Amino acid sequence: LIKVYKNPKKGLGSAIETRIKKSKKIYTCIFMCDLSDDTNDIVKYYNTVKRNKKLDAVLGTRFSKDSKVTNYPFLKLFLNRLANNIIKLIFFSDYNDFTNAFKIYKRKTLIKLLPIVSENFNVFLELPLKIVTRNYFYKIIPINWSGRKIGVSKFKIKEMSSMYIFTLFYCLFEKILLNKKRR
């Protein structure tokens, strides 16, 4: 069953926030519709989150020994790995694929992550960073990925890099403020 909702604002982040607010389901799975994500992994996500009710999210990684990645352009792969490893170091995290869109979340956890400040692809960085920095329970599982099968990418690295940097600093400052508040 597919439902279409009118998005009151422009942007991917706003569209995802609208869907989170309108959803009545327990879990929300976010993935790209270019068929690069292996839809069989949705079952792995769901089974993982159902087995452990404490989990707020299951974060997929394309970069574990059990993942299979094909047709990833070299420059894009290199920049992706570089960025994700820098993020991993900055946030002292065990997760290595923050920029990947394909994840599953408990809806009630997503509601607590609102508002979403990202308007574009950087929303896929914002959500897992908030999961990690706010100490929600998550599990990392290997997923498969193959290059885009349909459509044309709207991702422009020069335009998007500043948005990703903004999101990174936003979440870093939030982490610092949350840590001070807990003391």
Predicted segments, located by residue:
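Acidic donor-binding segment of Leloir-type glycosyltransferases
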Residues: 1-4
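Acceptor/aglycone-binding surface of glycosyltransferases and processive sugar-polymer synthases
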Residues: 7-22, 27, 40-121, 147-165
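Acidic metal-phosphate-binding loop of nucleotide-sugar-dependent transferases
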Residues: 35-37
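Catalytic donor-sugar/metal-binding loop of nucleotide-sugar-dependent glycosyltransferases
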Residues: 93-94, 116-119, 128-146
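Short linear elements at protein peripheries
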Residues: 104, 111-112, 129, 180-183
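DNA-recognition element of transcription regulators
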Residues: 125
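Terminal low-complexity segments of carbohydrate-biosynthetic enzymes
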Residues: 166-183
